[in-house]
């Protein structure tokens, strides 16, 4: 999968030029890497936002710059934390026949069988590192969890095997598990505690009753004497 993004070389200074570009709806960035010298660039911010929204950050981006095409990956994306705008992007030019490593999202698909019976599906790992040629990098890895019962879990080693890429993250790391609902477990503990308390009270009442009967019998015996 590859998308095309038209970019333009830009001057680093003056600062007012950068402000003007942003005012015009342009985002700023730089491209460097395989057979490419570090080059400051600008591009339509909305176009890249759409690319990321539709394909994720691991998509192969073919930059059209100065009449030539440069195959790149997004190496670093700096977003404004208050507004959904791009502050700066680093594109790294890549060699198409060499593997590269990136992080990709893990997406759980379906409703776990254990969740239908009152369990809770807990995801503990959200990304894994994968290795592939730039054009084979996955947008995400989907994992079917419909067969998971309460007490079952999935590790990295259980992720679907794909011929286009390989998972680099260690296989024994847990991805997700179906656990007993905390609320239900707490209710069970409360019920057990109440049952034990009732049993203790009953035993105490029996002991007290037996003791009272013995004392009464002893008093009656003394009266007769």
From Swiss-Prot:
InterPro entries: Rbsml_bL25/Gln-tRNA_synth_N (IPR020056), Ribosomal_bL25/Gln-tRNA_synth (IPR011035), Ribosomal_bL25_b-dom (IPR020057), Ribosomal_bL25_C (IPR037121), Ribosomal_bL25_long (IPR001021), Ribosomal_L25_dom (IPR029751), Ribosomal_uL5_bac-type (IPR020930). The keyword Electron transport does not apply. Gene3D superfamilies: Ribosomal protein L25, beta domain, Ribosomal Protein L25, Chain P. GO terms for molecular function: 5S rRNA binding; structural constituent of ribosome. It comes from the Bacteria. Residues 188-225 are annotated as: Disordered. GO terms for cellular component: cytosolic large ribosomal subunit. Keywords: Ribonucleoprotein, Ribosomal protein, RNA-binding, rRNA-binding. GO terms for biological process: translation. Residues 204-217 have a biased composition (Acidic residues). Belongs to the bacterial ribosomal protein bL25 family. CTC subfamily. This is one of the proteins that binds to the 5S RNA in the ribosome where it forms part of the central protuberance. NCBIfam families: bL25_bact_ctc, PRK05618.2-4. Part of the 50S ribosomal subunit; part of the 5S rRNA/L5/L18/L25 subcomplex. Contacts the 5S rRNA. Binds to the 5S rRNA independently of L5 and L18. This is Large ribosomal subunit protein bL25. It comes from Exiguobacterium sibiricum (strain DSM 17290 / CCUG 55495 / CIP 109462 / JCM 13490 / 255-15).
